[in-house]
Every structure is written in C-alpha cells, then in structure tokens.
Amino acid sequence: MTGFLGRAQGLGRLGKILEQAGKPRVRGCALASVSVLSLVVMSVAARAQPTGGSVVAGSAQISSSGASTLINQSTSKAIINWQSFSVGQGGSVQFNQPNASAITLNRVTGTSTSVIDGAIRANGQVWLLNPNGLLFGNGATINVSGLLATTSDIADQDFLGGRYNFSSTGGKGGISNSGSITASNGGSVVLSAPSVTNKGLIAASAGHVAMTGKVWRS
C-alpha cells in the first residue's frame, strides 16, 4: 500500500511491523502500553460533525447536510485544517478520493478531543491528526483504505513531498478505540499517541496494524 507505514530499524516488534510495510522512516517509536487511557472529553452533541474545515493544499470540496459530511477530493493528496473533527451517533463523514492510495490529511487546529461515534468511510486513506487526542466510541465504524490516527503532526511540505516525518506536538492527548476500524485488503491501521488503548475491533486483511508511542521526526 502506498502510505504511511515505513522502514524502521532497531525498534523490536514495531520495527518488524514497519519493515514489513516497507514505507517511510519513523524513529524513536515504542509500543504503547495497552492500559487505561484517560481522556478529558468535552461534551459532544449526539449528532456532532466536523466544523471549520479549510482546504489548505490539494483540491477538495466539503459539503454538509444534517449529520452527514461529504469530502470530494480530486487530487492524490489534500490537507484540510478543521476547527474540530468529531462524528456523532448516526452521523457520517464520506471521503470520495481518486483511488485507494490517495490521502486526505485532516488536522485539528482547535482545542477539543475528536470523538468519533459515527461512521467514517473512504475509498482512499484518511489521516486524523489531533494533539488533543482521539476517542473512537462504541458506535464508531471506520471503513477506509488505510487509517492513521495520531497526536503527532507533520509539516505540510513534508507531507506533500512524500517525506513522512512526524514530530511530537507536546500534547497530552491519547487515543482510545472501542469501535470498529477496518482497512481494505492490504491496507494499514496506525494509532500513534503517548498512550493508546484498544478495546474494539481493528481489521486489516493482508495489511498491518500498529499501536505506537511517541513518534519523533527523523
């Protein structure tokens, strides 16, 4: 899969996972303990949707109707900065992308945790970057070509240039999954934060799943 998992050396079990994926370099990783994750989650309306979306690179159109948000992307990569990115129960976010290797980078610039309790669907890859943390609730159903959920960040030009060097934001947010995350055949799922908890289902047939600690720029 053309994507975000990459070559790494001397990282034990995680390093082997990344070696098998054979994509960009990440260093300074450690497997996160699957422990109780403390997330201070702000009250989110039952039908909350992403807000304040601004396309800062690539070509994409954002439209919303009720509890549904649609992103039509026509370039292989796009960057969207959001004030907040949550999906309430019964809500959905649909990404229509050129192909399975296309990537939409969604960066939260506000101060709230992303609470996903609805559906995210994409025929390509979805990256969710939020230094405040991400919570996939019991109602979350994610069906994508590939998913990266992280509290780290990446420079726009690095992302666009295929240099997938992530840096810590210094935030204390974590990631918790109690829902269902599915990557298409050969796809990958990566959850990366200071602490990561998985109590749900993560499936990546013939692909890779990784839960990592802090990811530092190489």
Residues covered by each model-derived region:
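Solvent-exposed adhesion/ligand-recognition segments of exported proteins
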Residues: 2-218
